[in-house]
Amino acid sequence: MKKTILTVVLCVLTLNTALAQFDTAMFVSDVFLLDNYIKRQNNGINFKDTKTYRGTPYNNPNFLPGNIYKEGTLLADNIAIRYNAVADEMEVKQTLSSNDENARVLTKSQDIYVKIIEDIYVFVPYQGGVENGGYFQVIFEGGQIALYKKHIKEFIPEKKATSSITKTLPAVFKDKPVFYLVTKSGKFYQMPKSRSKKLKVFGEKQNQMKTFTKQYNLDLNKQEDLLTAVKYYDSL
């Protein structure tokens, strides 16, 4: 009888270990996938050699503490995460002091979201597929509407000096974020670059929004002012 109980316990422990390993594999891919993917996305730039370019291909060049959640349940706590905006990948390693070479790529899934310090990132599939989907930062989530931010990096290649009186200009990564209003049903409405056209996104309430933004002198091209306007819109 004791042997039977011991056998059952060992089987349960083995199964739990296997499930834990499987769960880990589900949200973290092989490290070589990360290395290969970055090489295809780096435009001939070595990301580690920061002297060769200006700006950063990342939202933040440093790994920061964060958590990973799956369907609202904590999956990984206080690990090191960095968002590669160029590759649209979440790079993950066990601790902040872990070697960057040990970083892995988080599996893209709409069921998994990331919190880096206080910033929340969600993965949104495109037409039901992962391939053309992407990560968005949740700036605000209200009762009726949410404000999402898509981090986009414009890459400007290095410009070699053409004469002795000119100098070589390093490659540049420029921030070109795009904001979206997101409805509860999951519809995305991109905010245009023009201030006046942004108001049209508010639809039937654009006149109220125009009055509000004028009253408080809000510049909808600035994230802080746009957030103020969206919060007001959500309250209407």
Question: Where is each model-derived feature located?
Answer:
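Exposed alpha-helical structural elements
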Residues: 17, 33, 109-111, 197, ...
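Short hydrophobic/aromatic-rich motifs at helix boundaries and adjacent loops
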Residues: 36-39, 180-184, 198-201
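Aromatic-patch recognition
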Residues: 59-192
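Long, compositionally biased interface segments
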Residues: 190-193, 199-236
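Bacterial Sec-dependent N-terminal signal peptides
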Residues: 1-25, 229
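N-terminal ordered "arm"
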Residues: 46-65
